[in-house]
């Protein structure tokens, strides 16, 4: 009730009645939702906040992986030009580009970074230390996350071609021969078999909600004669 409404009351009794009505109105406003309704509203707000955080965090991870490729591409170009020491994508990076993958049918390409630790895979595919460098003789093992760069492997087919550009600028062609699911502790996929091959590794299944898991999806490709 407005001050004008209080002023219209006649005498002290009228003022008391007006004040009583005013306070009664304020008490009614203060009651609003009862306790169960307030708790329900609070729970709904908490759920909305948690959902926004989860979605935002996932979007940030994906965005970081994609946007970092711009800086990584620049470092890769410098390395192809013979940069010594190898160019790093950003000043505090503890990795450097060592190769480039091109999935021919999907028309997608991505730069491979040195190392396969989590801090590397957050920004792109990583080369497993100790395996052959991309485009070099032997078994080159490359890993990436299933929900960013290696999400493309879900659509991989036997017979697909993958081109690999090595640090010297040479481009080699590999043909996908096998698609397998193995236990995370099965290291046979990283073995050197005396042939030139490319082994791509990511977590499986692709639609899993939790990160990691006990299974790995393995795409194996063998080097082809350079006819393309």
Language-model features: locations:
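N-terminal Lys/Arg-rich, disordered targeting/topogenic segments
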Residues: 1-35
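Solvent-exposed, non-transmembrane regions of membrane-associated and secreted proteins
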Residues: 19, 25, 36-228
């Amino acid at each position: 009730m407005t001050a004008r409404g209080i002023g219209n009351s006649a005498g002290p009794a009228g003022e008391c009645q007006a004040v009583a009505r005013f306070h009664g109105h304020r008490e009614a406003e203060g009651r609003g939702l009862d306790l169960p309704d307030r708790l329900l509203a609070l729970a709904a707000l908490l759920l909305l906040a948690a959902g926004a955080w989860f979605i935002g965090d996932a979007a940030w991870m994906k965005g970081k992986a994609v946007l970092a490729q711009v800086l990584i591409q620049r470092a890769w170009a410098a390395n192809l030009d013979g940069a010594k020491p190898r160019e790093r994508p950003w000043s505090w990076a503890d990795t450097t580009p060592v190769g480039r993958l091109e999935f021919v049918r999907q028309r997608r390409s991505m730069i491979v970074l040195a190392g396969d630790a989590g801090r590397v895979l957050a920004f792109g595919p990583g080369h497993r230390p100790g395996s052959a460098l991309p485009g070099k003789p032997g078994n080159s093992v490359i890993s990436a996350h299933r929900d960013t760069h290696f999400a493309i492997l879900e659509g991989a087919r036997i017979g697909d071609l993958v081109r690999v550009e090595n640090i010297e600028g040479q481009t080699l062609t590999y043909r996908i021969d096998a698609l397998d699911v193995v236990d995370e502790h099965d290291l046979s996929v990283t073995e050197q078999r005396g042939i030139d091959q490319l082994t791509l590794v990511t977590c499986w299944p692709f639609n899993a909600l939790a990160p990691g898991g006990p299974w790995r999806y393995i795409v194996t490709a063998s080097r082809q004669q350079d006819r393309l």
